[in-house]
């Protein structure tokens, strides 16, 4: 199993660039509480956000974050641009217990996971609607 450990937020990403890896259908507060991660409040050009930093495996830096004004209680995951791939997403899911529902994932992290929380292959009902 891949490990996930709390760490301090780094000021720089190893590649000098980060990307959103995924949007998890898990409330930020629940996730950081369950993982016992310290939370830091920051402000960027989109507003205030709560951030919790962690180390995935031996060296990959991961930020879990949520914009305070966002009414949707999901958790965004940011990683170094050099770690934006399917193995990072797979390791993250493994570290979180394997069954974390992913609302959206960066296309560069592999094929999107279209399974809904109930395990169906069409969570939005688009096939039945003819979309």
Model region roles, listed by residue range:
Residues 1-71, 82-126, 130-131:
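A cross-family detector of function-defining hotspots
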Residues 73-78:
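Beta-strand/loop substructures that line and gate deep hydrophobic ligand-binding cavities in soluble
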């Amino acid at each position: 199993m891949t490990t996930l450990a709390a760490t301090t937020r780094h000021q720089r990403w190893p590649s000098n660039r980060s990307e959103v890896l995924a949007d998890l259908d898990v409330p930020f507060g629940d996730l950081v509480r369950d993982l016992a991660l310290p939370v830091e409040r920051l402000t960027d050009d989109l507003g205030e956000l709560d951030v919790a930093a962690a180390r995935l495996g031996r060296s990959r830096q991961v930020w879990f974050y949520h914009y305070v004004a966002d009414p949707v209680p999901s958790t965004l995951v940011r990683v170094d641009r050099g770690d934006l791939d399917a193995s990072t997403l797979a390791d993250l899911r493994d570290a979180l217990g394997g069954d974390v529902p992913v609302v959206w994932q960066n296309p560069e992290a592999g094929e999107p996971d279209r399974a809904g929380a109930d395990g169906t292959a069409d969570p939005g009902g688009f096939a039945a609607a003819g979309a």
